[in-house]
Amino acid sequence: MNHEELINSLTKKMNGALQVLDADLKGLRVGQASAYFLDPVQVEAYNSRVPILQVATISVSDTKTILVQVWDKSLVKAVKKAIMEANLGVSIISDDNQIIRLQLPIPSEERRKELVKIAHKYQEKSKIIVRNIRRDGIELIKQMEQNTECSKDEAHIYSKEIQELTDKYCDKIDKIIKLKEQDIINL
């Protein structure tokens, strides 16, 4: 693997860390209803636990209401139970046949602070992923140096580039979290 391939590979992996962060943050409800809000819900169906998206269609009717249309009428109770057990702080306001309406309350100040803490945990998790990618990249540079694929000076330059890439992605993570924090606080 040459220097350019290594940097491209590390960049791709670090972009993956940003995608994981984005997916994590979509699960944090801040002000508006989102179809992603129910992603963590697992339903007991057909003798196993499955994601809610495998048994229902989720849509948003307005900023505070999520509609869950269960495909199989026999699973409506299981879906309602799974939503309640997920402890997402939603109220089931009606269930017309196979459609369950969920009302999202405006988060209290305490809940917003809790959401900010959760966002910061996601931030740290993402930074750890990026730093582990950096560590792996630097290990590869050291191996290249030992195998005389690059000189000591080149290895130093490559390591510095990897560190700059790491700093760039850590800054991106910080900016994403700062924006999310502002969204949460300014509800």
From Swiss-Prot:
Lineage top rank: taxon: Bacteria
Keyword vocabulary terms for this entry: Cytoplasm, Protein biosynthesis
A GO biological process held by the record: cytoplasmic translational termination
Main location as per UniProt: cytoplasm
GO cellular component terms given for this protein: cytosol
Subcellular compartments: Cytoplasm
GO MF terms held by the record: ribosomal large subunit binding
Gene3D superfamilies in the record: 3.30.1360.40, Ribosome-recycling factor
HAMAP family recorded: RRF (MF_00040)
Known role: Responsible for the release of ribosomes from messenger RNA at the termination of protein biosynthesis. May increase the efficiency of translation by recycling ribosomes from one round of translation to another.
Family of this protein: Belongs to the RRF family.
Cited PANTHER family: MITOCHONDRIAL RIBOSOME RECYCLING FACTOR PSEUDO 1, RIBOSOME RECYCLING FACTOR
NCBIfam families the UniProt entry points to: frr
Official protein name in the record: Ribosome-recycling factor
Protein species of origin: Orientia tsutsugamushi (strain Boryong)
